[in-house]
Amino acid sequence: MGHSRRPAGGEKKSRGFGRSKAAADVGDGRQAGKPQVKKAVFESTKKKEIGVSDLTLLSKISNEAINDNLKLRFEHDEIYTYIGHVLVSVNPFRDLGIYTDRVLESYRGKNRLEVPPHVFAVAESAYYNMKSYKDNQCVIISGESGAGKTEAAKRIMQYIASVSGGSDSSIQQTKDMVLATNPLLESFGNAKTLRNNNSSRFGKYLELEFNTNGEPVGANITNYLLEKSRVVGQITNERNFHIFYQFTKAAPQKYRDMFGIQQPQSYLYTSRSKCYDVPGVDDAAEFRDTINAMGVIGMTEAEQDEVFRMLAAILWIGNIQFAEDDSGNAAITDQSVVDFVAYLLEVDAAQVNKALTIRLMETARGGRRGSVYEVPLNTVQALAVRDALSKAIYFNLFDWIVGRVNSSLTARGSVANSIGILDIYGFEIFEKNSFEQLCINYVNEKLQQIFIQLTLKAEQDEYAREQIQWTPIKYFDNKVVCSLIEDKRPPGVFAALNDACATAHADSGAADNTFVGRLNFLGQNPNFESRQGQFIVKHYAGDVSYAVEGMTDKNKDQLLKDLLNLAGSSSNQFVHTLFPNQVNQDDKRRPPTASDKIKASANDLVATLMKAQPSYIRTIKPNDNKAPREYNQGNVLHQIKYLGLQENVRIRRAGFAYRQTFDKFVERFYLLSPKTSYAGDYTWTGDEESGARQILKDTSIPAEEYQMGITKVFVKTPETLFALETMRDRYWHNMAIRIQRAWRNYLRYRIECAIRIQRFWRRMTGGLEFIKLRDQGHQVLQGKKERRRMSLLGSRRFLGDYVGVGNKGGPGEMIHNGAGINGSENILFSCRGEVLISKFGRSSKPAPRIFVLLTTQTNRHVYIVAQTLVNNQLQIASERTIPIGAIKSVSTSNLKDDWFSLVVGGQEPDPLMNCVFKTEFFTHLTNALRGQLNLKIADHIEYNKKPGKLATVKVVKDPGASNVDSYKSSTIHTSAGEPPSSVSKPTPRPKQVAARPVTKGKLLRPGGPGGGPSKLASRPAPARQPMPQPTPQPAAVQPPPAPRPAVSPAAQPRPVPQPVAAVAAAQHTRNASSSSTRAPPPPPPATPPAAQRKPMAKVLYDFNSDQSNELSIRAGDLVQIVSKEGNGWWLCMNTTTSVQGWTPEAYLEEQVAASPKPAPPPPPPAAPRASPVPATNGAAAAVAAKAKAKPAPPAPPAKRPNMAGRKVAPAPPAAPRDSAVSMNSHDSSGGSGRGTPNSASNASLAGGLAEALKARQHAMQGHHDEDDEW
């Protein structure tokens, strides 16, 4: 229910999964529940409100203000208004289009605060409360005749049938049967009156039964107060029950032939009021709906035939006419009508004559049966007997139909809860009111009493009982009126009526006079007045005057034994079903009167309603003319007063909207507090009251929004309750989101892992084709040509199209188009180079060109493309195009130069070309010729300088030549190259980098496969134990100083990746002294025992290997020995890069750790060859000089250790690393335990100097040791 007068701050909040609750304001500026951010989109899409949709928001509470608001909304087609949970409905007398499926769906799963007032909202609330709280519900619809009670009941049934779910066929069948009861019971129980074209002339309480899933499994209907007198007579402009007009107008020919059915004008019971039609109602179509409804509820064709046989009998009984005979007694005027009635009832015609014209009288004496006399009836008495028979047949037939419907609607499963819908005709005040109006108004008084007890009195009584502070409201309790009618002591109206019937039962007039005398005893009651032949009862709806005449006869409600005997003599089994009771001729007890029956029925109804949680719909009739847009303020104001709407508004404004026992409240909302629940389980150990307090505290409900009673918690506004419901729904919604997030995280993690595997695989295998092509180039040269050092790099790949001639866009496309190369051709090779150009009278000189090699099925050429400037414009054109098949040979030298010639032998000179990627060109050309390339490698280059004139170009090795070849006078000067047998070096290992997280954001794994951060990332420095300041070491021993990053857990809680060099620098810094010039301190105290040093080895010879499990080392390096094998191989680790691998034992010399001495002498000046670790290029040069004097290193053992038995740390893969595991470590305790040893533990004075002396000694004696080994 959106309010246009909501104070600033009142917001709306949508609930998850279909239900929403609004956090609207309480009304004094406070906001119920937790404040929410206003959503402008919601406000902008809301329909503009007319007046106020809840009367509790009226600024002035009065009957006139309520009337004005209802009128304003009625004029704008807004017929529904709230009073808290009570719905006020004004009958529009026309179709507003507000009951369509689209409108129904808009109310599904919504609370009343977020949708406009509607009967669908009441139905949704009742259904939701039944499912959520497992309480039986009932909807009490009250109001006067013609106010729209029946329509409201039908819409509630429509909504519940639509939203109650259930795809099972039996459940759907139950829904269909429940909906089918409407047209069926309306046909037999509704009629046109002066005030209403479809007035319910009976009371109906429909109880829908549901299983634990909220699916309808059955229903039960209880009917009250059928107005059977309407069967035999109606006032002008009213009609009999609808079924008579439907049957007479639209009966099929079968029934017309069997039962003699004619038009309604032919029957007394349907023509007495001279009203045969209802505006806007098609009786024929309604009859088809009735027949269809009979089929839906399972009524067989035989049963339908019997029902219509009884209807025909009633119509024909009404046509029996009487006249006085010579004795003044009643005589039937047309025997043929009696004979047809006898045919329909399947009895003897003579028995019908006797039952209608003669009454059996029995005399008794001394308690014994006496004589039986046949007393003739006069015409008035005969007509009364005739009408009594018709009324009895129709009344019993209606009860049979209701019972038949209940039989079909019997629950087909266990019943958990129910929703009841009460539709009973409302308060009636006519010009002449009789016994029927008294009964109707009495039942409405009982319903009003329920409303007072459940909404007003019970409200205040509960507040007092629970010791809740609130302002009491005065109200009118109509219990005194109910007591006036139903009490026995002192006797009420019904008791006086029964006494008059028992005292003067023979004469109706005498009985009526006796009744008037009994009423005089009620004159002292302030709600009763007795007048001549009438009495007035002051009902809650107004004063009603009742006529005494005929009340006693109507109260007797006794079918003569003659008529019961007639029914008992029928050979029709259905008639026996309608009149099952056998006549007990000896029973002298007074049968129950009509007032006794209606009193018992009303009390049973009240007891049923009191067992359920009620919802109220108060219907209002805007005018007596059934006009669509007419609003009679006087009539509506009267209804507002007797419905007690003003008191209802006042009590609602002063009370609490929701109350619940502590245990049920905690059971419903314990999920909202982390102290009362964990993972969906109830964890509170205290009592229910303390648990309820904790829930309200943790949900931030203001203290003024609730009160704690003795056994219940009271919530002031519905907005607060809806906020709790919203939070409860959001709890499950959030749990679902967590599961979804975890699942999406898993999928993302799986995809990320697959991508990384694919990326690694592409990185490992994507360049294999280029590497294979490069290795093929070595075979093409046949080991006859020296190689350039850059050509043997491990990172060299034969990529082919270096200029990008085959690409779209860029300079390559310009060359492609300028040279006239077809776009569909396959570019094998393109590169920039030079061609030797000969000019007349001048020496030849190289000129830049672009070489393109392409092959297709139809075009296989070598293009030589020239770029020239013509008028300052770049011109690109193919200078020469050589078919690949025309190339007889390729001539090149055996030195490392880049010159070669394509020997064609045509009319043009052979091109002499200079290309840095010559080997790759030879390889592609070989493949294009399918291995038939004639490559000539000699000490010179041959080519046809002119057609038929073979020329040679010398290639000489010039030690003074630069790295760039030079051509002069048919001689090419080049420097020395790598040996012709050289092959490409292994692919270099990429630089080790920190691993990236496997996933991003707040997902499962923040780091590598282990879920932690990268070990290469910056970590807090380990706590250093206090130690004495070391003595300065020689510069030759100290590593170069490097800045050490200051890292602390508090300053950097998250590791930051750093380059390996930075990590290594930090390690070396810890190994060095902080100063080399500081004065020596006094002798230090005793130091703790030094940590055990890990075995180290010095590298004696260079060892290069392209195997992934072998470690390449350089002479003079120090490596850490991880393990030793007895087959000549040691597993070592490079202390700088933390890379492990196998190394020949003969290439290493294990270093013996010297024991620390207390005070070593200062070392002598360091000699150039005394450096312990050759860390600079200068030191490397010294080692190279020393290597010239040493013999060749020994060959590595032929057999390496079995790698399957030991896992060797692989070389770091290409950056970026996919794993968070790093072989580099800050200390020996981290990582895998094979990290670089931390020399900080040996940083004492004695240990440092001793290690320096030992290293210097080994360096000086290394040459002799090597000679001894070889």
UniProtKB/Swiss-Prot annotation:
Residue ranges, annotated region (Disordered): 1-40, 960-1102, 1144-1270
Keywords, alphabetical: Actin-binding, ATP-binding, Cytoplasm, Cytoskeleton, Hydrolase, Motor protein, Myosin, Nucleotide-binding, Phosphoprotein, Repeat, SH3 domain
Subcellular localization, as worded in the UniProt entry: Cytoplasm, Cytoskeleton, Actin patch
Compositional bias annotation for Polar residues: 963-974
Compositionally biased region (Pro residues): 1023-1058, 1079-1088, 1157-1167
Domain topic, free-text comment: The myosin motor domain displays actin-stimulated ATPase activity and generates a mechanochemical force. The tail domain participates in molecular interactions that specify the role of the motor domain. It is composed of several tail homology (TH) domains, namely a putative phospholipid-binding myosin tail domain (also named TH1), an Ala- and Pro-rich domain (TH2), followed by an SH3 domain and a C-terminal acidic domain (TH3).
Protein name (database record): Myosin-1
Origin species: Aspergillus niger (strain ATCC MYA-4892 / CBS 513.88 / FGSC A1513)
